[in-house]
């Protein structure tokens, strides 16, 4: 049975006599932070995305009550105008300023995008599910410079759903210009909706550290509810912070309220030229640090990272991590989401497709493109690019890939992963012996047709169509 590398099946990757460097780079990205399945990372058990979502919602409470899962909720929120003290006894109340109000609404929106929750603002004496307020002094009346914020899970008590922020902290006062302030808002709202920290720790209880985590993926690379740096799991955000729910948070909130299947059902673009109307999905310059997990309910969608000059690694498989814009492991795709297309920048990029019909554009630089299964349209762009194939199912005769800007003498078609027995060879016609490559040139259509017969018959299982004439001697890695 043929194996498709895009399915991340180990069996597809064995027994290569001399895999190429391009193949190895694909292998490395497809296996980038594998998780769950009994793995141990950093001396801790590794959790799958689903198991992490369960852990983050382990109290099993939402605004629908205890042990109610996947049920939508229409919630209210309110910016408090006064309060004698917080439920913890902190005093010195300050109402939210304009920047806090604006950023809190964006944070609420980011949760509503991924789950079946709606938020309606109320004022005056009306009660609300989620409330916002600042404090400046601790319960002893001293100015508080030691805390950041805290919140309470859903419930029927007076404290339930309240969120509180230390106004003495710069990023709390200015979440519009300081990323950690925005992340704090999203984090505390997560608590107010029913999400826990991934582990049993709190900032006010002792001196917790990453060594106290329950599972390895308890970092900000996977959850905005975590306290711990993404560097613990191999990521590097270079001092930047996420603004919206991350990969495991999406699984967690959807466990409680269900998935929002009305979000971005059209053709959405993430990154440069974004039409998402979400700041954390949008880049307008190369200085913008993108940190996000994509949730998208439909359409023909694109990751556009064309404005970066860094070497990038872009993986369109759901649940995967990508290195974008000079950061590491900073972009992910939520489980069940299909992003069809990717655009690289001017660096030497690696682009990996999924099982959909992908369009991959490498842009400038020496890029490596792997479409996986599906009828893909591949553009290397300028530079010396490599198009990698690992199985006959990567480009079927009935639905072939197209290489649309192949530069003979510069670009390469890498078939080394198919040459497991060192028996691939070019022929003028198929003999039925297997391991045969046939390259036909259609001058009238300006198209080269690359056929492979890997079985012991005379019918090809594999076809790639290439615009332009390809050289048998110069353009292949076998």
From Swiss-Prot:
Its EC number is 3.4.24.40. Ca(2+) 4 binds at residues 354, 356, 358, 371, 376. Ca(2+) 1 binds at residues 264, 266, 296, 298, 301. Gene3D superfamilies: Collagenase (Catalytic Domain), Serralysin-like metalloprotease, C-terminal. The active site is at residue 188. It is an enzyme of class 3 (hydrolase). Binds 7 Ca(2+) ions per subunit. Ca(2+) 6 binds at residues 372, 374, 376, 394, 401. InterPro entries: Hemolysin-typ_Ca-bd_CS, Hemolysn_Ca-bd, MetalloPept_cat_dom_sf, Pept_M10_metallopeptidase, Pept_M10B, Peptidase_M10B_C, Peptidase_Metallo, Serralysin-like. Its cofactor is Ca(2+); Zn(2+). Belongs to the peptidase M10B family. Could be the homolog of prtA from strain B374. This is Serralysin C.
